[in-house]
């Protein structure tokens, strides 16, 4: 399989590899970094993990497990020539999970690790989503969402109609969806739903069911 990377800038001592969220989302949402990191002399590298963005998209679900992604990341590091003198990882959301696991196994190769918008425990995240975020929603809207989830009706257009203004605009990108940046919309349009559901689960209210990541805990 082939995975896609793109290098922006050149700094022999500071090279930041971007671990995108999702799982299955791709690099597009982070294109905003181009407006300020190069000015600071920071080299950074986009990396679409296998199954996401511009990388190959195999359909075998056996590939969507955390240890395999960790070893894939190590192969990418070697291919890019990154080492303990210059290699920084930036992990956002699911990328934070991947970054933590990589650091635990291959920490000797890292100069630094940055985690953004991710907790160190999937069960704690699930509790937060249900006990804090869900309770901030309109009870009638939440009841509709939960009813659709109970039926497994995640592909119902009304499900996304409810989530977009009541969840995504409040907790994912806090401006009206009509004003979302083009790269963010481009990334959402390309998300690998099969990979996302296999690892995260179909609901935004925590990881449940058969989600591969639901028991992950490094707290």
Give names to the regions the model predicted:
Residues 4-57, 62, 77:
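Conserved HGGG/HGGXW glycine-rich cap/lid loop of the alpha/beta-hydrolase fold
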Residues 30-31, 56-59, 124-129, 179:
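Short aromatic-enriched loop/helix-cap "lid" or pocket-rim segments at secondary-structure transitions
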Residues 32, 68-75, 101, 166:
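Alpha-helical elements of Rossmann-like donor-binding domains used by nucleotide-donor carbohydrate transfer enzymes
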Residues 36, 76-79, 105, 170-173:
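Structured segments of extracytoplasmic/periplasmic soluble domains
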Residues 46-90, 94:
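Active-site loop/oxyanion-hole signature of alpha/beta-hydrolase fold enzymes
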Residues 83-129:
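Conserved hydrolase catalytic core segment
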Residues 113-154:
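Flexible "cap/lid" loop of the alpha/beta hydrolase fold
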Residues 143-218:
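Alpha/beta-hydrolase
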């Amino acid at each position: 399989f082939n995975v896609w990377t793109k290098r922006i800038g050149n700094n022999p001592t500071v090279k930041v590899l971007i671990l995108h969220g999702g799982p299955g989302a791709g690099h597009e949402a982070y294109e905003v970094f181009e407006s300020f990191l190069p000015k600071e002399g920071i080299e950074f590298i986009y990396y679409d993990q296998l199954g996401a963005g511009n990388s190959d998209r195999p359909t075998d679900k056996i590939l969507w497990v955390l240890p395999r992604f960790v070893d894939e990341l190590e192969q990418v590091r070697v291919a890019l020539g990154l080492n303990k003198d210059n290699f920084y990882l930036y992990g956002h959301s699911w990328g934070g999970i991947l970054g933590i696991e990589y650091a635990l196994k291959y920490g000797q190769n890292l100069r630094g690790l940055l985690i953004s918008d991710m907790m160190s425990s999937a069960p704690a995240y699930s509790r937060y989503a249900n006990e804090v975020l869900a309770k901030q929603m309109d009870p009638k809207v939440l009841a509709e969402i939960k009813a659709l989830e109970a039926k497994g009706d995640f592909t119902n257009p009304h499900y996304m109609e409810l989530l977009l203004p009541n969840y995504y605009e409040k907790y994912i990108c806090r401006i009206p969806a009509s004003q979302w940046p083009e790269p963010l919309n481009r990334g959402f349009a390309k998300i690998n739903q099969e990979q996302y559901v296999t690892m995260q689960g179909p609901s935004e209210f925590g990881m449940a069911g058969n989600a591969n990541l639901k028991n992950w805990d490094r707290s």
